[in-house]
Amino acid sequence: RPLGLGVLGWHTYLQSKGIPFEGLSAQYETRKIFSQIKIESERASRALAEVYGEPLWCNGTGFRNTHLRAIAPTVSNSKLAGNISPGIEPWAANVFTEQSAKGTFIRRNTVLEEVLEDNELNTPEIWEQILKDGGSIQNIEELDDVLMGDWDEPVKNVFKTFKEINQLELVNQAGIRQQYIDQSVSLNLAFPSQAPP
């Protein structure tokens, strides 16, 4: 039976560690985590094959499963898991409104909320400005000198939104990730409307 193990909340994870989506640190984390997922999923499939045997279509492989890893969009799951980023995608905005059958809700990036709280900037005025700027924090002057993480990264680099991130970085990370994935990868890119075709 094929499986599709993947990740949920990649951008949230990077932000919680103070790692910008762009750069060598994020690429290192991509390689480290996805290689570990590959190692552990193959180990588990071999262990299951020892207990339950290899299915006919896996005969001679030592595995219980034909496929183990895939990257899928996980928007619904990310909401259920506590408002974390979907799958491998960056956050589209650090604050946004969401409409559902139960009403309209304001969703905030919880990691950013903690950073703002730690710097005594978690105010309605700041969130209003972020919302007015389409979810971006780049125009919040109070954050100009705020650093975070082990490498003292500027907060404005860590909390860039999907459209603010160089899209080539998403492609680079997908290339790193693909060598550890044995199924397809769903990857979205965001280009400005004025970008040439």
List PLM regions with ranges.
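Internal maturation/activation junctions in enzymes
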Residues: 1-2, 14-74, 127, 151-157, ...
